[in-house]
Amino acid sequence: HRAGNMLLAKALNESGLPVEAVVLKDVGYPKDESVLDDAATIVIFCTGHGGHVLNRKLKEFDALMKKGKGVVMIHWATEAVKGDPADKFLEWMGGFCDLHWSVNPHWIPMFKPRKHEIWNGVKPFSVNDEWYYHMRFVNDLKGVTPILTDVPPASTLKRPDGARSGNPTVRKA
């Protein structure tokens, strides 16, 4: 995931936005945790679920979140193990990818602007990608602001059951 982190940091640093994106040299959670002290937002792009970098650092990361730092988790980093990790993801982000509940098939959504400042200047768009859906969210989406939403086609429900591919719950929903 390092290459993806480097590409994202480069794009952010060249965007003209008032940000300084830094990619840490450590693989996994930083050995010197003080490097996170000055971060306004922490972006995590890593293997998820049982291999997630935060599984063994929930207490330390929770302390950062309680200081008001932002968090962005990309792709598999949204996957949490049931129990403490899942509970913390709900607290920090309002939702997560829950294996055998959520699915991530390739499909082409049509995203339309919503009334939110992040949509300023963005036109409707669609991209054929692996879009997660049927995510596990906090009750009543309290504190969650949906930004990209669409209803996946029925064809995404035809895959066999698996951790990320299909399950009776998603087909019933």
Predicted segment positions?
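Catalytic beta-strand/loop cores that center a nucleophilic Ser/Cys/Thr
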Residues: 13, 98-173
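A glycine-rich, often tryptophan-bearing local segment used as a flexible ligand/cofactor-contacting loop or short
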Residues: 51-124
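Short, functional N-terminal and low-complexity linear motifs
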Residues: 28-30, 85, 173
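Short, charged/polar low-complexity linear motifs in solvent-exposed/disordered segments
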Residues: 19, 90-91, 165
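Helical hinge/lid and interdomain linker segments adjacent to catalytic or ligand-binding clefts
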Residues: 2-80
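Short secondary-structure boundary micro-motifs
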Residues: 47, 92-93, 130, 163
